[in-house]
Amino acid sequence: MEPFADALFWVGAVTVLWLSVSSLWSLINGIRVWILGNGNLMRASSLGKWAVVTGATDGIGKAYAEELARRGFAIVLISRTQEKLDEVSKAIESKYKVETKTISADFGSVDIYPKIESGLAGLEIGVLVNNVGVSYSYPEFFLNIPDVDSFINNMININIMSVCQMTRLVLPRMVDRSKGVILNVASASGMYPVPLLTLYSSTKAFVDFFSRGLDAEYKSKGIIIQSVLPFYVTTKLSKIRKPTLDIPTPERYVKAQLSTIGLQTQSNGYLPHAIMGWVTASLLPAKLLNKYVMGMGLSQRARYLKKQKQG
């Protein structure tokens, strides 16, 4: 029995040592990311004059445009409605005293990229924020989605094609200059399957994998590419208006997220969201999480349909 007991002792000792080292490293890394941060990286003086933001007139996109302008970047605002673009552009120029440029484009279409390429020609772009996105009006079974064929095309064009094409347009000049940051705003919904939002969740999983793969490809070229995976933020897309500790305003979220750049390839961007991401993706069994998310979706779907029926 002694050899067996000795073996058990060493297995236990190595396990305790590994857990201790792992816990210590997690603590040190957490302090580095969430307390010390890397806020000084995101400056026009170190990356390049211009920051390009898609979906820039509302929510997280607008918050990125404003915060990057505050840090000294000139801003290219890309969104669908010229009137909203002009309004945000004027406000940013007035408040932050930086140059702006607007490009109106409907990312639901695939023929917009020559226009965008022309609008970006000659600009020294230090930052690209691929933020534009679309979700479901309400949770629904895949085959029950109204006009599902059009829905599929629109969501893929906006959530996936925009990220690929905007990266294609901007990345070459970043590589030439050996510096630049690309932030691809995915969603915590891309960390695991979300039944009844299946297509949306899948597009965000694509954005996450695309970002992490490209970061590995171009890190040696001096480029940072980060996958940003927020949980709920008070935006039109989330339909939540009242901020809480775990549901921040876009402004609060963006300020926190920008401090993680260069420290995390894949980031929830905000400490409460990082804790939620760790619990849901690492601690909860997949079957239990799937059951919980499905139940939540069914409840939201029932409330929406009841409200629609009542008129």
UniProtKB/Swiss-Prot annotation:
GO terms for cellular component: endoplasmic reticulum; endoplasmic reticulum membrane. One of its GO terms (biological process) is fatty acid biosynthetic process. The chain crosses the membrane at residues 8-28, 125-145, 269-289. One of its GO terms (molecular function) is oxidoreductase activity. Keywords: Endoplasmic reticulum, Lipid biosynthesis, Lipid metabolism, Membrane, NADP, Oxidoreductase, Steroid biosynthesis, Transmembrane, Transmembrane helix. NADP(+) binds at residues 48-77. The keyword Lipid biosynthesis applies. It is an enzyme of class 1 (oxidoreductase). The active site is at residue 200. Substrate binds at residue 187. Pfam families: adh_short (PF00106). It is a multi-pass membrane protein. It catalyses: a very-long-chain (3R)-3-hydroxyacyl-CoA + NADP(+) = a very-long-chain 3-oxoacyl-CoA + NADPH + H(+); 17beta-estradiol + NAD(+) = estrone + NADH + H(+); 17beta-estradiol + NADP(+) = estrone + NADPH + H(+). Pathway: Lipid metabolism; fatty acid biosynthesis; Steroid biosynthesis; estrogen biosynthesis. It is found in: Endoplasmic reticulum membrane. Its EC number is 1.1.1.330, 1.1.1.62. Belongs to the short-chain dehydrogenases/reductases (SDR) family. 17-beta-HSD 3 subfamily. Catalyzes the second of the four reactions of the long-chain fatty acids elongation cycle. This endoplasmic reticulum-bound enzymatic process, allows the addition of two carbons to the chain of long- and very long-chain fatty acids/VLCFAs per cycle. This enzyme has a 3-ketoacyl-CoA reductase activity, reducing 3-ketoacyl-CoA to 3-hydroxyacyl-CoA, within each cycle of fatty acid elongation. Thereby, it may participate in the production of VLCFAs of different chain lengths that are involved in multiple biological processes as precursors of membrane lipids and lipid mediators. This is Very-long-chain 3-oxoacyl-CoA reductase-B. It comes from Danio rerio (Zebrafish).
